[in-house]
């Protein structure tokens, strides 16, 4: 794997639009890791047509980092199961690892994910609730030197923070950025991302995925016209006829590709 993820085609597939479920952590009745159930979940995602799998995010984001080596063990287990099952099924899956914490921790997690063959990191900024835009951008820039980054706009109700238009414009201008998962559950915050990406000049290069569970259909179908620009597409056609196992899929792709009026 190269640091930009182009060698295995993962970057291009991510840009085309995929269904990418967040892997839940399977536990036994004794609250211990259940490898049999975990394997079944991962195989189901592949068989259902998922184009990517995100590991160490969502319901597994925090707890697996509290036990020594458990984060690495979960990432390794998921990688091995997906590699084996996709080979049997003659398909490919983009592997995304969650990356969180302050810069030192995030660097360590990014390096681990890259060493295990993950294609990109979904970067949480929850560890910086009071940081300035300059500080946030520098943090992201540091992580992009380790692994391709997908931004994550998490709703404030579950630990996210408000991220302004200026941050998203500068975020989109950084190198080695693949896209953004937009899940603030807020239309105005979502529009800040749209405007920031459009004004970055890189709208045609980045893929934007919706995690707005309260507005999935609207995100997939709405077209936007940022001020001073031609119409922007907020949606992508479905890439699979199989059951959708996760609602976080590409939207907002190739925003404002044309020049101002």
Task: Label the predicted regions.
Residues 142-145, 155-261:
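Catalytic alpha/beta core domains of metabolic enzymes, predominantly
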């Amino acid at each position: 794997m190269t640091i930009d993820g182009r060698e295995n085609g993962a970057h291009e597939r991510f840009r085309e639009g995929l269904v990418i479920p967040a892997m839940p952590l399977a536990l036994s009745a004794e609250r211990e890791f259940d490898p049999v159930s975990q394997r079944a979940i991962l195989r189901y995602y592949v068989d259902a047509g998922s184009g990517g799998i995100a590991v160490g995010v969502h319901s597994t984001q925090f707890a697996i980092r509290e036990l020594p080596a458990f984060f690495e063990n979960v990432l390794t287990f998921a990688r091995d199961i997906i590699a084996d099952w996709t080979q049997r099924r003659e398909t490919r899956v983009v592997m995304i690892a969650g990356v969180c914490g302050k810069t030192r921790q995030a660097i360590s997690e990014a390096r681990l994910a890259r060493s295990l063959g993950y294609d990109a990191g979904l970067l949480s900024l929850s560890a910086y609730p009071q940081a300035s835009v300059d500080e946030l951008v520098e943090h992201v820039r540091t992580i992009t030197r380790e692994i391709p980054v997908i931004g994550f706009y998490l709703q404030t109700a579950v630990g996210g923070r408000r991220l302004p238009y200026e941050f998203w414009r500068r975020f989109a201008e950084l190198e080695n950025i693949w896209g953004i998962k937009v899940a603030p559950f807020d239309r105005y915050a979502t529009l800040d991302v749209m405007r920031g990406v459009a004004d970055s000049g890189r709208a045609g290069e980045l893929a934007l995925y919706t995690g707005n569970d309260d507005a999935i259909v609207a995100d997939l179908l709405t077209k936007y016209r940022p001020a001073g620009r031609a119409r922007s597409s907020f949606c992508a056609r479905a890439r699979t006829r199989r059951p959708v196992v996760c609602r976080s899929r590409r939207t907002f792709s190739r925003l404002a590709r044309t020049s101002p009026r």
